[in-house]
Amino acid sequence: MSEHYYSEKPSVKSNKQTWSFRLRNKDFTFTSDSGVFSKKEVDFGSRLLIDSFEEPEVEGGILDVGCGYGPIGLSLASDFKDRTIHMIDVNERAVELSNENAEQNGITNVKIYQSDLFSNVDSAQTFASILTNPPIRAGKKVVHAIFEKSAEHLKASGELWIVIQKKQGAPSAIEKLEELFDEVSVVQKKKGYYIIKAKKV
């Protein structure tokens, strides 16, 4: 089987790189590595999701599903210091990098842990917002499972924020979300990427 960034234990040889990137008007230092998604820069889709995200009206934590080396969760943790940001990824190397990046950016209001989808998320835990740049290459079944589990783990009036390219299935993603959520809207479109917000009322 060929290896992907959504593999649990990447076997590709480690080749760490450290670089700086500006997100939400703040400078961050990230260390990335082989075997994680978009290792040389914060990818356009994640940047668009980070820039588009608005703090939820409801109180509570925020969950970053498929956190990679951490740009989404850490940039939001830096902005919303009174909230705890949970960051999960199936990829053990990604989880290690996220922890390293939290430390080198002085971010403490995070809980970062390995989880295959929501397998290690407390079944009773609910969040004010969940964000994901879903692993499209893992297949529609996995992406839809993220949507389904997100619906279960959101508070009342909580929101799921997603970035997905039109060519990678944004229209079918919207259809699936409309089955699960009360309000679904496209809040941003840019260069073929959609930012979709799905809300539980």
UniProtKB/Swiss-Prot annotation:
Gene3D superfamilies: Vaccinia Virus protein VP39 (3.40.50.150). GO terms for biological process: rRNA base methylation. GO terms for molecular function: rRNA (guanine-N2-)-methyltransferase activity. It holds the Pfam family MTS. Coiled coil: none annotated. The keyword ATP-binding does not apply. Belongs to the methyltransferase superfamily. This is Uncharacterized protein YbxB. It comes from Bacillus subtilis (strain 168). The lineage of its organism: Bacteria, Bacillati, Bacillota, Bacilli, Bacillales. The gene is ybxB.
